[in-house]
A protein has these predicted regions:
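Conserved aromatic anchor
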Residues: 11-23
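Extracellular low-complexity, O-glycosylation-prone stalks/linkers
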Residues: 22-42, 66
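Beta-strand-rich modules
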Residues: 54-76
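Extracellular fibronectin type III
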Residues: 72-95
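Sequence/structural signature of beta-propeller modules
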Residues: 92-142, 393-397
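Beta-strand-rich domains and repeat architectures in extracellular enzymes and scaffolds
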Residues: 134-171
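Loop/turn-rich, solvent-exposed surfaces of beta-rich toroidal or solenoidal domains
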Residues: 293-341
Length: 397
């Protein structure tokens, strides 16, 4: 095998390696010196596991790792040559940050370039319902520190507000920050099974649906409540219940009126959303396609309110000097009970267009407010960064 990455965390080290077809498993060895005695840390059965975390180590100490693959046949085991020795030092890891990344308080936020330039903030934002995005200064990813999390999706689920993020450097797993729905205070972090860009997320009343690259995955809402009741600073989700491909790439997702809408973001041409019924058989969910809807290029998020109005963020690039730059909010009125003969839902004309700050990633509706999440504060090229989830009263749109 080839070790693709090694990383030190709090009293732990994690390794990633390439999957090797045809082997029976892997052996991982470690030592406190490069030329010292190596101890077997873990024997892994099967070739599909490509990650290992060694815990219980001393803090602020360098450890050395090497590994082999092995094949077992007719009771005999053959072990490969050792990989190159790689090292990592354990480090202290701070708690996940709760405060805003750039603007520490209301006064500083209202002095920001974005607030001064965009009426979406100065005229439409309800500051008391808006809140700082956690984890942008630091996220404790199961004992490893990430300062490069990009916030992507937001949805309301039960008594919680969920915010997803992925590590832009690819060093750590993606996460969901769990916040109290009413107070918007950060509670804990759920660490996801992989590093996929979790660009969208939805809640159907039983399960959390999430993008996994070009697939859709889901896991039970009970994983959220378990993470909260554990009282820990983080919990880990070992695996999704199920994931599968759909008719489109998965960049946009929302749940409304018993329909899970899934769509792709196309940065140069219009695209489609597909509306699916969720069918449960033998305790597993399946998706049955029933609707389509055309969406503009560069659509990043969609949400519906209880009256059937649809809100859509269309956003691309960090500033207006970039090709194809846009950052808008559109409002439409739909009749979801009147698809055409091709089962296409027609949007009609825009009822409202609002110019937004750059990098509007996603939206959700809860109560009488629309919540818009931004990632601009994580990009140095963004001249008008927003480090908040911005609440806008629906009646103002």
């Amino acid at each position: 095998p080839v070790v693709s990455a090694i990383r030190g965390g709090s009293k732990r080290v994690k390794l990633y390696w390439n999957k090797i077809n045809g082997v029976s498993g892997y052996n991982i060895y470690y030592s406190t010196s490069p030329n010292g005695t190596y101890t077997l840390a873990k024997k892994i059965s099967g070739n599909s596991t490509v990650k290992y975390v060694k815990t219980g180590l001393n803090q602020k100490q360098t450890y050395y790792f090497k590994m082999t693959s092995y094949i077992t046949n007719n009771g005999y085991t053959t072990e490969s040559a050792f990989t190159k020795v790689l090292s990592a030092k354990t480090v202290s890891v701070s708690s996940t940050s709760k405060g805003a990344k750039k603007y520490a308080n209301k006064t500083k936020f209202k002095k920001s370039a974005a607030y001064k330039k965009y009426k979406a903030l100065s005229s439409y934002m309800t500051y008391s319902k808006s809140f700082a995005i956690p984890g942008l200064k630091n996220t404790n990813v199961a004992g490893f520190a990430s300062k490069t999390m990009i916030p992507k999706a937001i949805c309301q689920a039960g008594g919680y507000m969920l915010v997803s993020a992925y590590d832009s450097t690819g060093k750590d797993e993606s996460v969901i920050y769990i916040l109290n729905r009413a107070s918007h205070s950060y509670i804990t972090t759920l660490v996801l099974p992989n590093k996929a860009n979790v660009s969208c997320m939805a809640y159907d009343g039983k399960n959390i649906w999430i993008s996994k690259g070009d697939k859709v995955a889901y896991f039970p809402f009970s994983a959220i409540t378990k993470a909260v009741t554990s009282g820990g600073s983080y919990s880990t989700l070992s695996a999704y219940t199920r994931y599968f491909a759909v008719q489109t790439k998965v960049n946009i997702m929302t749940y409304y009126n018993n329909t899970l809408w899934i769509g792709a973001t196309n940065n140069t041409a219009s695209s489609k959303m597909y509306g699916y019924s969720i069918v449960t058989q033998n305790n597993l969910c399946y998706l049955t396609s029933k609707y389509t809807m055309a969406i503009p290029s560069r659509t990043t998020g969609v949400a519906f309110d209880k009256d059937g109005y649809m809100y859509m963020t269309v956003s691309y690039a960090t500033n207006s000097s970039k090709a194809n730059y846009i950052s808008k909010l559109y409002k439409f009125k739909l009749d979801l009970n009147a698809p055409n003969k091709s089962n296409q839902i027609l949007k009609g004309s825009k009822l409202k267009t609002l110019t937004l700050p750059p990098k509007a990633e996603n939206v959700c509706v809860y109560g009488s407010y629309l919540y818009t999440i931004y990632s601009g504060s994580m990009y140095s090229s963004c001249k008008y960064p927003v480090d908040r989830v911005v609440a806008t009263k629906l009646s103002s749109l």
